[in-house]
Amino acid sequence: MRSLKLILASASVVSATCPYMSGEMPNSQNGPLDRRHDTLSDPTDQFLSKFYIDDEQSVLTTDVGGPIEDQHSLKAGNRGPTLLEDFIFRQKIQHFDHERVPERAVHARGAGAHGVFTSYNNWSNITAASFLNAAGKQTPVFVRFSTVAGSRGSVDSARDIHGFATRLYTDEGNFDIVGNNVPVFFIQDAIQFPDLIHAVKPQPDSEIPQAATAHDTAWDFFSQQPSSLHALFWAMSGHGIPRSMRHVDGWGVHTFRLVTDEGNSTLVKFRWKTLQGRAGLVWEEAQALGGKNPDFHRQDLWDAIESGRYPEWELGFQLVNEADQSKFDFDLLDPTKIIPEELVPFTPIGKMVLNRNPKNYFAETEQIMFQPGHVVRGIDFTDDPLLQGRLYSYLDTQLNRHGGPNFEQLPINRPRIPFHNNNRDGAGQMFIPLNTAAYTPNSMSNGFPQQANRTHNRGFFTAPGRMVNGPLVRELSPSFNDVWSQPRLFYNSLTVFEKQFLVNAMRFENSHVRSETVRKNVIIQLNRVDNDLARRVALAIGVEPPSPDPTFYHNKTTVPIGTFGTNLLRLDGLKIALLTRDDGSFTIAEQLRAAFNSANNKVDIVLVGSSLDPQRGVNMTYSGADGSIFDAVIVVGGLLTSASTQYPRGRPLRIITDAYAYGKPVGAVGDGSNEALRDVLMAAGGDASNGLDQPGVYISNDVSEAYVRSVLDGLTAYRFLNRFPLDR
């Protein structure tokens, strides 16, 4: 018998004053480029490293530790049948057959990251939540961004509401803010959630379309359930197709309660405000990205964190006294309504920085389970009927995904503090409880684990002032009835170009609706929001334009609410393409790269050429480049126009032409610049009759600091909307 030297592989263990009081914003302190050694990540690494398996210098083994000496199955002779006794084969194949777990019913497509939340101040005057009880106090977090309707394999750039779920691993337990990138939802009562999802998911007969609402059942539901209009307007705007997950806000959607140690309660809405600035894609660009890079959003987030350009968000609270909740012309318990910011400004509470990518997608991003019922002392619920249903649904669905009740024991789901209770057994139990008296009250274990209360061991408590009374009814409050005024508020608050984008989105979606009845019903609902909007959509989808239905018309606006028309706050991780020729243009390109890096080293400079050439710095080929994946495009030394087998015909011109058509900054440096950009304008349908001096177009004969600064200013402006036509 051959002997093996047995090596057992074991798991390695790796081991302030509120700035607003002085009128200063906190500075962003980016750590070193290697995020794995960032000190802010230490609490996360220290906890999760207990579960790491390091295969370095190890021997391949079975799941039970037996060394494996060969990768062939056991056979009776070298051409004979495989034997059933081959336990190595059986174990490997069986594990593979069961690797996949059911995907989330919604929010299946997602990406996540670890980080840290820092409180700006001691907020114990408004909440007993311990993670907010000291200025500078830090709490580990994990955030998962997602789309809603698509399956796990769908594209990132699909038009959709986007999930923004945050877990804070506080020193008194886990607190989840399970929100979206828009502040409202489609329905007011959780009992309709299955109806909504059945309607927006692919048609049940054909399983078409994937990750899209451009079909009959979705718009049938929207037109029959007008509470969906407000969220629908947000989804049809730039919020439905964001530039990246770094450029979205996160909203808690519901009204919650904050409760102090003394029992005083305040109503609150949560918002994570992006400190990168909000930014959206345009629809043709989003469609192109779906084919060119289906992982565009998750790659953007991953790359930003890997390069040390940590995205940041500021947590804000809208605070309303309990006694004032009836002073608004809408109900604070209605999840289809916002509190306009001019009525209740946000109080800045703290800052979140995402600074560490997952080490294993499945173990962390896929297995994390968020639950609105994960609250801590100082946070309480309201009677929002959608929230009350989510408290059940988000917990129940985990039984299907994880096959038992012990999903909270998974490393990514565990609190960072000890936990003790009488829950026992179940599939996948990971602990060995020592207490034989698994019940309360008991004397056999001296009453342990003992109950906490409001004054002893800081037990969770409900706001003392909460009371419930009234007859049992199946109805919504009449204060929920007006579902048209706030969609109009949203529409009124968009810029003229953003309104055009929304109109175009509704035209596109409804052009795919086959039922004339559904299309007519859609126009009826849109007309209750805005007659001009309804007429513009109707004319494009074969429906007679309606007369005004002014019951809910008004001229109110709120703060800038869209994703275009405001400057970006940071340029971190944006990409500028330098289109090179196979000649002396590389010298100019390298000068440009150096100048951009000197002016702002947070922007990525990508040299595009016919073939990869590390010595010249060419890190992308024309065959792999596209105008959708860059934020600005500059031609260096004239356009490459010759035919080549290395890229599709006309690709260099197409890259910059598409970038121009998407409203992005474009430019040219060196010989042939004017000719190149004139070709671009002609190909894109632009107007070059008045010269090339127009917003977002940058021309120079040589590299200069002024030229580089002008392009960076164009990136800050983000998109040049004058290139997009408006309805006359």
UniProtKB/Swiss-Prot annotation:
It catalyses: 2 H2O2 = O2 + 2 H2O. One of its GO terms (molecular function) is catalase activity. Its cofactor is heme. Its EC number is 1.11.1.6. It comes from the Eukaryota. Keywords: Heme, Hydrogen peroxide, Iron, Metal-binding, Oxidoreductase, Peroxidase, Secreted. GO terms for biological process: hydrogen peroxide catabolic process; response to oxidative stress. InterPro entries: Catalase (IPR018028), Catalase_AS (IPR024708), Catalase_clade2 (IPR024712), Catalase_clade2_helical (IPR043156), Catalase_core (IPR011614), Catalase_immune_responsive (IPR010582), Catalase_large_C (IPR041399), Catalase_sf (IPR020835). Its main location: secreted. Heme binds at Y394. It is found in: Secreted. Transmembrane segments: none annotated. The active site is at H107, N180. The keyword Secreted applies. GO terms for cellular component: cytosol; extracellular region. Belongs to the catalase family. Occurs in almost all aerobically respiring organisms and serves to protect cells from the toxic effects of hydrogen peroxide. This is Catalase B. It comes from Ajellomyces capsulatus (Darling's disease fungus).
